[in-house]
């Protein structure tokens, strides 16, 4: 009984995290135009560190553990949106050629196996 409940809990937690990520991408539109991506990144830089601090304080109070102070996040001296968009473009191009590359590699592997079995 306990393994089934634990399995269900894991499924629900993973599903809620995935659903939250999908909602966040839909709501903030980080894969859209560069100005929206930059605005979403700046908003995340402002919101995430205080939320992590509050959560760590809550965990400390509830469990009695002492969590060391995290270092400040690094400041970037370049426009991350340029690199972000180029990364998205590269990933999407790799995904678009993946089926043809998989077919090509499987064909080469099949030919190799035919040669070896002769």
Curated annotation (Swiss-Prot):
It comes from the Eukaryota. Its main location: mitochondrion. The keyword Transmembrane helix applies. GO terms for biological process: cristae formation. The chain crosses the membrane at residues 8-26. It is a single-pass membrane protein. Residues 27-118 are mitochondrial intermembrane. Pfam families: QIL1. This is MICOS complex subunit MIC13. GO terms for cellular component: MICOS complex; mitochondrial crista junction; mitochondrial inner membrane. InterPro entries: Mic13 (IPR026769). Component of the MICOS complex, a large protein complex of the mitochondrial inner membrane that plays crucial roles in the maintenance of crista junctions, inner membrane architecture, and formation of contact sites to the outer membrane. Constituent of mature MICOS complex, it is required for the formation of cristae junction (CJ) and maintenance of cristae morphology. Required for the incorporation of MICOS10/MIC10 into the MICOS complex. Component of the mitochondrial contact site and cristae organizing system (MICOS) complex, composed of at least MICOS10/MIC10, CHCHD3/MIC19, CHCHD6/MIC25, APOO/MIC26, MICOS13/MIC13, APOOL/MIC27 and IMMT/MIC60. The MICOS complex associates with mitochondrial outer membrane proteins SAMM50, MTX1 and MTX2 (together described as components of the mitochondrial outer membrane sorting assembly machinery (SAM) complex) and DNAJC11, mitochondrial inner membrane protein TMEM11 and with HSPA9. It is found in: Mitochondrion inner membrane. Belongs to the MICOS complex subunit Mic13 family. Keywords: Membrane, Mitochondrion, Mitochondrion inner membrane, Transmembrane, Transmembrane helix. The gene is MICOS13. Residues 1-7 are mitochondrial matrix.
